[in-house]
Amino acid sequence: MVKINSNWITITRLKSLFLFLGFLLCSMGAKADHVMGSDMGYQCLGGGKYKLIIKFYRDCRGASAPPSWSLLYWYAGNNQGQSTSRYSISMSRVGIRDITPRCSTASSPCSPQNTSYTGDGVEEHTYEANIDISKSPFTGVGLGTTYCDLTFAYNQCCRNAAITTGATWADFWTTATINVCNVNKMKVKCNTSPQLSNVPVGYACCNQA
């Protein structure tokens, strides 16, 4: 008669379960955790038309970035509040560039471009879309004094582990606000947001101030 140790079977099954859960968690982590930062601005095109511009900074150790975003939030009010709505708009990617700080002779750690888990590097992904704030659903914004601030917002998952200003794995939100009342008071009725002249510093040298 063969004696089977039930305790040994239980321990073996538990080990298998823990290994499976560990693999599952690692797989989940590998699919996200790639957002290092982003900024959002707008360019006036005239006649109430604007180009929205999103610059998304991807950690090349994480997942690849999508070719477009199709969901954008907007809300109108004073002091960036009130009347939140969803507005479906296609933010198409118009460019990708490697902004990893490195020696000129060093190869790119983000090669191939926009490929998951390639190395310790940073990519800048630029997304754009045109809107007309004189037409629906923005009709009426800025005509009085109640709804002056038109704020656009989008989110992307997930924040990477290197970010210390908030929880890792949480959604990363970015906003841009147009004060339509102030624009309407201008002679040219047109305003463009400030543009950053330098790319963000993703990595700093040891002992660098």
Label each PLM-derived region with a short phrase.
Residues 2-18:
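Bacterial N-terminal signal peptides that target proteins for export
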Residues 12, 26-28, 125:
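Generic signature of intrinsically disordered, low-complexity, basic-rich segments
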Residues 31-209:
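Long, compositionally biased, intrinsically disordered segments
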